[in-house]
Amino acid sequence: MYSQQPFPPFAFNAGLIQDPANCHFGGYTGLGHPQPFSFAFSTLKSENGDSGVQGMGDCSAPVMPWNSMASFDHHGQVETNQQGNPIRAPSPTPTLSDSRIKVKEEVAHETDSGEESPEPKYPSPPNPSLYYPNTWTGSPFWQVNPTAGNNSNSTNPMPSQTLVKNGSLPGNTTYPTPANQSPNTPVDCVVSSMESSRCSSANSSNGAINERATTIPNGGMVDGGQSSDNEEEVPSESEMEQFAKDLKHKRVSMGYTQADVGYALGVLYGKMFSQTTICRFESLQLSFKNMCQLKPFLERWLVEAENNDNLQELINREQVIAQTRKRKRRTNIENIVKGTLESYFMKCSKPGAQEMVQIAKELNMDKDVVRVWFCNRRQKGKRQGMPTVDENDGEGYDVGQTMASPPVGHYSLPQVVTSQGYMAAPLGSTPPLYASAFHKNELFPQPLPHAMPMGGHIG
């Protein structure tokens, strides 16, 4: 009635593995892998004795072991190499149940004999099964390398393999194996070889550490916290006091001054000390830490002074060379420049960095010279007791102003100062006031307080 589109027959590709029970396909094997492999999974015998097969009919599938990483049973299968010759399959790995039965038999044998074994009663866990993630040859399954028996002739080393514990994930506990390790090698041999190599590497590393600890150059610390002979010990206070006395006695006997000693240290060792430092060392006025730092230099100087007769000549020659070096000349400022600086000083006695740069540019001078002049000028004003512009809140001094006395009682006679700065004749017993003769806005104004009283009470 309806035409159905024909479908191609179902066929297995090369990557599928047939089920060992052929009841599902009626005995039809289909297209399998070119290699004559058919993996038949054996049943696992439980602890109660039964085979663990629960099912009905011929199609009941065998019960698989719980271990997901267990090796396959190659019983009844034939494996061939690349040339087509049959090879021997690796021996099956003992299962967990076999190991338990073996342990029970050993325990029963020990209880029957009545003797305790020197070995621990609880045996070690069963040997882990082998798992090789990488193939040994180009084929998709394991094949024995024909040159595996002769390791010396093999040119290309095999990739490193891993040992995975039975029933655990691949990344849980892995053990690196040698590149030329064969899958037929027992697990005990592999583990023992790894333990021996690990112990040998640990012993070699410990030996290298001990060797480095015992041979430390340049006066380093040795094992046990003890210092080497090259490291100088810290002297005590009594030893430091005795050394200071000996230093002073030898220095005076050889004819050296304290300044000569400080200068000689600079000539010989590149670190010059002042005469004050040497004096304080001899009188034990330095701190103990500074004296400990200075003592090695003075000890070397004593040895050099006793053995070298030309040390005094060397010191004198160096002093002459130092005195003949060019010294910075004193800065001379012209009177016109001084007057300009005074005018700037009256405006602001402590200018900032930008103002100093501007003043230096206007006067064609160095900035440091301007800075030093302002510092000296402020110190000069402090010595003379003259108030500066900053002390008067930035106000300039103006002597050409009218100064009147405050009213005292009912009689007050104001005194007026002329614009020329000369004061009028006093009246009565009023004390005179002598003002400077400089004009307004002229240089060097006199710092006089404002509104000074000019008259007194008459009566």
UniProtKB/Swiss-Prot annotation:
Q: Which SMART domains match?
A: HOX, POU
Q: Sorted alphabetically, which keywords does the UniProt record give?
A: Activator, Developmental protein, Differentiation, DNA-binding, Homeobox, Nucleus, Transcription, Transcription regulation
Q: Which family does it belong to?
A: Belongs to the POU transcription factor family. Class-5 subfamily.
Q: Which CDD domains match?
A: homeodomain (cd00086)
Q: Which SUPFAM superfamilies match?
A: Homeodomain-like, lambda repressor-like DNA-binding domains
Domain of life per record: Eukaryota
Give the gene name. pou5f1.1
Signal peptide position in this chain?
Answer: none
- Under which name does UniProt file this protein? POU domain, class 5, transcription factor 1.1
Its taxonomic placement starts with: Eukaryota, Metazoa, Chordata, Craniata, Vertebrata
Coarse class of the primary localization is nucleus
Which purpose does this protein serve, as stated in its record?
Transcription factor that binds to the octamer motif (5'-ATTTGCAT-3'). Activates transcription when directly bound to the octamer DNA sequence, but can form repression complexes with other proteins at the promoter site to inhibit transcription. Binds to the promoter of the vent2-B gene to activate transcription when in the presence of other BMP signaling factors also bound to the promoter. Inhibits the competence of ectodermal cells to respond to BMP during embryogenesis thereby inhibiting epidermal differentiation and promoting neural induction.
Q: Where is the composition biased (Basic and acidic residues)?
A: 99-112
Q: What PROSITE patterns does the entry give?
A: HOMEOBOX_1, HOMEOBOX_2, POU_2, POU_3
How the protein assembles, per its UniProt entry? Interacts with components of the transcription complex that assembles on the vent2-B gene, including vent2 (via C-terminus), smad1 and smad4. Forms a repression complex on the promoters of the gsc and mix2 genes via interactions with the nodal/activin signaling pathway transducers foxh1/fast1, gtf2ird1/wbscr11 and smad2. Forms a repression complex on the promoters of the nodal/nr1 and siamois genes with the maternal factors tcf7l1/tcf3 and vegt.
Q: Locate the POU-specific domain: which residues?
A: 232-306
Which residue intervals are the DNA-binding region? Answer: 326-385
Q: Where is the composition biased (Acidic residues)?
A: 229-238
Is Nucleus one of the keywords UniProt gives this record?
yes
Q: Where in the cell is it found?
A: Nucleus
Q: What is a single molecular function from GO for this protein?
A: SMAD binding
GO annotation, cellular component aspect:
nucleus; transcription regulator complex
Q: Where is this region: Disordered?
A: 78-131, 216-238
